[in-house]
Amino acid sequence: MTQTPEALTTEQFKQAIIDKGQYYHIYHPFHVMMYEGKATQQQIQAWVANRYYYQINIPLKDAAIMANCPNQRVRQEWIQRMIDQDGEYPDGGGREAWLRLAEAVGLSREQVISEELVLPGVRFAVDAYVNFARRASWREAASSSLTELFAPQIHQSRLESWPQHYPWIDDKGYEYFRSRLSQARRDVEHGLTITLDSFTTHEQQQRMLEILQFKLDILWSILDALTLAYVHNEAPYHSVTQERVWHKGLFK
């Protein structure tokens, strides 16, 4: 009879989660290019405009987690993530801070909000994340947020390198990165507690690690799409037209 593998201890499981950081998108060539000061203004703008679509969908992901969660105490803590991103009226929260970043790199907020620069590959990756959060159990969807473990490092790297390499970016644009340094650390504590308490068998733990890899795949795929379009100059339909003919704004 096949013996069921033993579950990891809490510390082993936590370390296995941390080890996934080697696949975080901070190591993607597109991000390395930006960090090293080798990106053009157009490439920076493209990243900001496309990442906006990710930013505005994070509250929808968090709303889906809360909608599936029967635990009031968890919802009371989780809702802070939505407030961070959407703000409390009339404050625009993280979304408004991202639009200030867009203006700081030379984009108009109208162009960014229109989503006309959002590549199909980016849209599909982000939509897959939101749909996962809607369909998965709230515990599984919550655990996917643990890429935040690695987020402070990526935000700090931008704050350290971008002002040096891209002096044309207005300093007011960096507020989003500054705010996320503390917010991400707080979010990690909550998400990690839920994850370590929820996945206690070998099978559950391995599934959770696959879920975390799924989230890492999403972040990596976003940069793959940007690389194809803005490094290799092979945007969708590049072989037949230079126009942005891909679909836009179907689901607003």
UniProtKB/Swiss-Prot annotation:
GO terms for molecular function: pyrroloquinoline-quinone synthase activity. It holds the Pfam family TENA_THI-4. Coiled coil: none annotated. Keywords: Oxidoreductase, PQQ biosynthesis. It catalyses: 6-(2-amino-2-carboxyethyl)-7,8-dioxo-1,2,3,4,7,8-hexahydroquinoline-2,4-dicarboxylate + 3 O2 = pyrroloquinoline quinone + 2 H2O2 + 2 H2O + H(+). Pathway: Cofactor biosynthesis; pyrroloquinoline quinone biosynthesis. Belongs to the PqqC family. This is Pyrroloquinoline-quinone synthase. The lineage of its organism: Bacteria, Pseudomonadati, Pseudomonadota, Gammaproteobacteria, Moraxellales. The gene is pqqC.
